[in-house]
């Protein structure tokens, strides 16, 4: 038998008073406790199916229903919370006439509810006086405040559809709502009359004593919807909302998605003076620091001993150490440079050098028998040369080991590690009578010094290579050539720079 020949039945019978009632019915259909309707009612079925208390839920894709039709003449829709409501009209509108609301207010409508009476009931306080603010809210043609509707059950059933159109006396009210689950729209259509709901003939899903009482909607039906009003809207009875399992299920879902976290340590207030926390009074220590619950992962670490957890270190409130970048020495302020010798003077002396180390050093010269040791003379600080920095030290003479030792060549033996010293030509005095640029290189004992005289003073610089500072020697000079090889022309007042023989003056290098 095809679906068109199967008798159509309503999904449930009752009344949906709140968004929570509709969500419970949607969940019952998704879980298989209730069934979706596969099609719209036929013309012959409308008289029996479109009755007060009938609720139909259909899936848009599976049923192919784009628009629900029931053959009843309805008024324009109005918003009531998350629902759209319609009221049955006494007669349909003439063809081509717009569905305009009546301008003048009638004392009694065909539906049995007067707008003036409804406003009076809505805005009447405990002392019988009316408030103008509430009356202004109720006069809007759109949605009505759910809190106001909870105090007036009649207004909660029809919203603002009071006397705007020629409503049918004792006619039906249609209430619709839609949700999306996994990108599939699901629609609910409910029919009721004001008299049946007011008399208590129609029950709600949340107050049902049967299987619907234990239906808990899934979080997607609540959190992933574009509802105008929140799910805990005020038009739901507080007792029903608290007793329904949704309240506890929603709280468990929130706790699961956003678990509470604990701070392992806390810092003092921004206005509090930073000092040692041990010196703080008990009243000034934050409460979270005085009493802290155990971490949540403690039980996991006990169960899994192999798991590692790096605790967060407490803040360091100690005063930072003061560093002096300059120090007085020999009556002159000199910058204090931190080296490895100043940090740990005994590190290198305590190292074991019995066995050869796999370090790569130059073996071009054998300095074991040479009196000239390579090292930097610390003339600035007047400190003795560290023995470990001497190339004749056994630590520096360790044999390098890289793979096969047979491939290494024997070091070249030289009688003298450096050529004989030479004296640089003396420069002529400058215009002011001082030696502007004069330098001489000489070797004295085991140290090689470069004595440099200028207008500011004389100082010694340790030298291990030939150094030449340009001057104005006219005896051994060469003309300055530009990169093209041409001789530069200078006037008599501005003589050209000269270079010693053998130097590459075209590149301007020493």
From Swiss-Prot:
The keyword Hydrolase does not apply. This is Global transcription regulator sge1. GO terms for cellular component: nucleus. The lineage of its organism: Eukaryota, Fungi, Dikarya, Ascomycota, Pezizomycotina. InterPro entries: Gti1/Pac2. Belongs to the MIT1/WOR1 family. Residues 94-152, 393-438, 469-510 are annotated as: Disordered. Coiled coil: none annotated. It is found in: Nucleus. Residues 471-480, 501-510 have a biased composition (Polar residues).
